[in-house]
Design a protein with these regions (language model features):
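Structured helix-beta-strand junction loops
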Residues: 3-5, 33-37, 60, 80, ...
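Acidic, PIN/NYN-like endoribonuclease modules and their adjacent C-terminal/linker elements
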Residues: 74, 78-112
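PIN/NYN-family metal-dependent endoribonuclease catalytic core
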Residues: 1-23, 37-45
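IMPase-like, lithium-sensitive Mg2+-dependent phosphomonoesterase catalytic core
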Residues: 1-3, 13, 26-29, 102, ...
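Alpha-helix capping/helix-boundary segments
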Residues: 13, 46, 73, 90-91
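Active-site neighborhoods of divalent-metal-dependent phosphate/nucleic-acid chemistry enzymes
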Residues: 39-85
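A short acidic, often aromatic-flanked loop/helix-cap motif at beta-alpha or helix-coil junctions
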Residues: 15-16, 45-49, 108-112
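A short secondary-structure junction motif
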Residues: 12-32, 51-59
């Protein structure tokens, strides 16, 4: 697995991860763990990239697959030159349009 210094997060990803917390204590622990990671920030370029990607997906009739937050996460990774590490098939649709580097965290269907 990657070292913590090799991982980065962005605010939309943190919101998604923290949404899954089972309660206040779990939320606090997870938030503290995330604070130790490098943070990539949304920029106007990332916002524009997310919109371009959604438009390209719409041209193929696939714009209703990836959630808007997934488009923004992918765009932030792209503009910062980061590899998109994910466990969601919708990112495969995004990557086919953007051509950005991406990797599955684990083989699809193997994590709970």
């Amino acid at each position: 697995m990657l070292a913590r210094r090799d991982l980065a997060v962005c605010a939309p990803l943190q919101l998604e991860l923290l949404y899954s917390a089972r309660g206040p204590a779990d939320y606090s622990v997870l938030r503290e763990e995330l604070e130790g990671l490098v943070e990539l920030h949304a920029t106007p370029d990332a916002e524009a990239e997310a919109l371009r990607t959604q438009q390209a997906l719409a041209a193929k009739g696939q714009h209703r697959g990836p959630k808007p937050v997934d488009l923004l996460i992918a765009a932030i990774a792209k503009v910062h030159g980061a590899v998109l590490l994910h466990y969601d098939r919708h990112f495969d649709l995004i990557v086919r349009v953007t051509g950005q580097p991406a990797e599955w965290l684990a083989r699809r269907g193997t994590l709970g």
